[in-house]
């Protein structure tokens, strides 16, 4: 399966809307979907997505902070763990379950620690604070073909600048609209 270099983050989406939103995303080429664990009923949402889209998308959790959460996500059948930080224990537990590990990093030291711990790709977070030029400098010391994603402050107006500096992809938030919060 070839993946679009965009990862949809379904932050704050309720279980009764998660499949409808995923339908739209998948119909438009998204094939990596993350549900942050600080969303409402995240494991139930992940389970619904896994049940419907296992053959069409890589489904998993974000904001994974500890090994217990890795196991909880693994139990849903998901295959992706995204973390906001570089936690060696989380990375190693993720790889123990043969899942894809994308930990967050901010510095060259964190990036190399994540890769040495077994990470499959890196999430540069928050990207708006790092900036594409700093990312480019850090990427020069990473092993060739390291997949790097930018998250936090990435949008249609600045995505091209990141692409020009060879970012592998971006993570984009899908959040409920202000109207949805009142329903």
Model feature map: region roles:
Residues 5, 53-60, 96-102, 142-149:
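Short beta-strand/loop segments at the ligand-binding rim of alpha/beta enzyme cores
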Residues 173-183:
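Single conserved hydrophobic/aromatic residue that forms the stacking wall/gate
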Residues 1-76:
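Conserved N-terminal beta1-alpha1 strand-loop-helix module at the mouth
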Residues 33-39, 58-65, 78-85, 101-106, ...:
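Catalytic beta/alpha-barrel core
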């Amino acid at each position: 399966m070839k993946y679009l270099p965009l990862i949809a983050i379904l932050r704050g989406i309720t279980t009764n809307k998660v499949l409808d939103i995923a339908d739209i995303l998948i119909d438009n080429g998204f094939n990596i979907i993350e549900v942050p664990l600080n969303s409402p009923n995240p494991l139930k949402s992940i389970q619904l997505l896994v049940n419907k889209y296992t053959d069409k998308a890589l489904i998993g959790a974000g904001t994974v902070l500890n090994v217990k959460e890795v196991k909880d996500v693994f139990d849903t059948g998901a295959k992706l763990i995204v973390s906001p930080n570089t936690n060696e224990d989380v990375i190693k537990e993720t790889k123990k379950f043969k899942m894809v590990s994308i930990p967050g990093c901010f510095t060259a030291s964190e990036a190399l620690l994540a890769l040495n711990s077994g990470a499959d790709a890196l999430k540069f977070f928050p990207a708006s604070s790092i900036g594409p030029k700093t990312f480019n400098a850090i990427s020069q010391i990473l092993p060739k073909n390291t997949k790097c994603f930018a998250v936090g402050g990435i949008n249609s107006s600045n995505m091209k600048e990141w692409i020009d500096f060879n970012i592998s992809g971006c993570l984009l938030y899908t959040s409920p609209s202000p109207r949805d919060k009142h329903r």
